């Protein structure tokens, strides 16, 4: 069974955690930006399904 030979230093551990948290921060910022764009109506890259109205068939 594979076992690490030496203990990982706190500095190396903190580097990995910082990188992981930075990636999470970027993803959260992008998600917030996309949400704001959708709510403000300035989003161009989204396709919204248009509800079909029954009133058009009666004319």
From Swiss-Prot:
A Pfam family of this chain: Ribosomal_L32p
Domain of life: Bacteria
InterPro entries (alphabetical): Ribosomal_bL32, Ribosomal_bL32_plant/cyanobact, Ribosomal_zn-bd
Molecular function as annotated in GO: structural constituent of ribosome
Single GO BP term: translation
Record flagged with keyword GTP-binding: no
Key words of the record: Ribonucleoprotein, Ribosomal protein
GO cellular component term, pick one: large ribosomal subunit
Family: Belongs to the bacterial ribosomal protein bL32 family.
Protein name per Swiss-Prot or TrEMBL: Large ribosomal subunit protein bL32
Species: Synechococcus sp. (strain RCC307)
Phylogenetic placement of the source organism: Bacteria, Bacillati, Cyanobacteriota, Cyanophyceae, Synechococcales
Gene: rpmF
């Amino acid at each position: 069974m594979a076992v690490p030979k030496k203990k990982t230093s706190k500095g190396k551990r903190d580097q990995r955690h910082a990188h992981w948290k930075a990636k999470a921060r970027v993803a959260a910022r992008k998600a917030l930006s996309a949400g704001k764009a959708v709510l403000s109506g300035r989003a161009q890259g989204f396709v919204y399904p248009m509800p079909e109205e029954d009133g058009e068939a009666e004319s």
